[in-house]
Amino acid sequence: MSEHDPRGTDRVRYGTINHEYGLKLATTEPGDDGPVWMINLMKYREVAEYGDGSAGISGREADDRYMPVESLRAVGARIVFLADVEEVLLGDGVMWDRVAVVKYPTRRSFIEMQSRPDFRRQHVHKDAGMQQTIVIGGVPLSIPKSTDEPAAVQWSKVPHPPTGDDGPVVVVHVLQFHDVDDAANTPSEMQVYQSAAAQVALQHGLRVSGWFSAEGTIVGDGRPWHQIRFHTFPSRRAFVEVVQDPDRLAHQKEFRDSAISDTYTMILRASIDDLASSVD
């Protein structure tokens, strides 16, 4: 899992720290503070680099050793989503390995965890295993309820229900919009697209696990992000049917592509998925 100390240098081996957002996390007044969901995109080294001659393990194995469950519990935080990346469909060529979401009770609790001795002792494993990471602080975004959208269909009744060979998948969209200063405001072009896409996706069993507006990227590569959306489908085949729908494709070309300036879209297989209940 990917966390960090925002008070240190501007750059760590796996990304660049945004100190302005780190200061916001540390200084938000208690009356204005509240839960924050830290959304982690993780790319591992093939072999962990400890730098001390330690026997070689994979970057993923090093991250498993790092996972700071006890430190999280001590500050009231918990892992609400953990998934392996099955495929990166859209992006800049980075083949992400894992996506995780940690819910913190407050922004300040995120900072407090970084100072814990037990957390700092574990950090050596993350530093050794992580090649690149993006960590985005998000808050829940209202999901539009258009009156003309069809009701969600039970998975047992969709054309491509989950099977033993093709179970549920989560599709995550990490979005940067053109000229949007407020991540909570979805551009009008995107609103048109998402309404049309919902007409198709809901018939194939779409369940929205959570939409988040990005209030800051605490570790990354300098790019700003606006929204992160998690969509669950009963099977990969169900998602593919949505992708290939002609009407959805037409709306993508006319509206979605003009609204988005940068994105990652990934198919995930989750081992922990309490995301929807964590937002309620």
Question: Which residues make up each language-model segment?
Answer:
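Short S/T/G/P-rich N-terminal loop/turn motif that feeds into the first structured element of a domain
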Residues: 1-99, 105-112, 129-250, 261-280
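A common structural junction motif
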Residues: 118-124, 247-253
